[in-house]
């Protein structure tokens, strides 16, 4: 009987070692063998009795993988006829004296009352298992390069929601601190400032600093000062605008006067020059026509004198001179 268990233990150890090896292998042949090994194993066991009566023999089915990886595992029948039957070591009946304990020395052991531990365990274990499963799933996804693109897309999808959650968290803390400040001066730090402001020290130092004033008393002063500054700023704004319009009017007036004086003086000079030019032109035309008329008259007079001289010369030539005493 011990030989049979030894054979089964050896085959079980071999199968377990082979299965661990195949779980880490990535070749196609090992994947095929891994699929075959994941099928349920069939064992047909028989009951063992210590009596000397004959027991019915049944074959035991053991799943044994072959040496080559390409072939499927074979089912080998191991006959149990040749295995020795367990026999009692001795046929002598021995009497064993059982000593009863003393009632005075026997102390009742009180069961440990750990109902709270069980409740805590029952409450915590589901969350622990869930977190463990999610962590293992996360590790598997990180280790798989084919899922990196999906992980990046999911990160880009959930990152704005995470930022929005942090923003709502910080706004809630600030709003609660503001509501507490409306109630009066608080010298004691709040729950958040006492326990959770350490990691966010640069952000919440000013928020968690105790305020030495009451907001209901300081708010009117601050608001009045703010309103005064607003009205002063508005008045200065309108004064600046009015000064700008004044400067614009001055510039426009200067430009208008400059343009008007220059334009009117230019037109006046142009008129005077034009009149003088016209007078000179008329004088030139008059002188021109006067010279032409004078030339014509002089020519006529010269021609007339010449004709008269010719007639006189002819007359004197034709008529004899008279003797005048």
Curated annotation (Swiss-Prot):
Tell me the compartments it is located in. Answer: Membrane
The record gives the membrane topology as: Multi-pass membrane protein
GO CC annotations? membrane
- Its transmembrane ranges are 159-179, 292-312
Q: What is its main location?
A: membrane
Recite the UniProt keywords alphabetically: Membrane, Transmembrane, Transmembrane helix
Q: What is this protein called?
A: Uncharacterized protein F54C8.6
Name the source organism: Caenorhabditis elegans
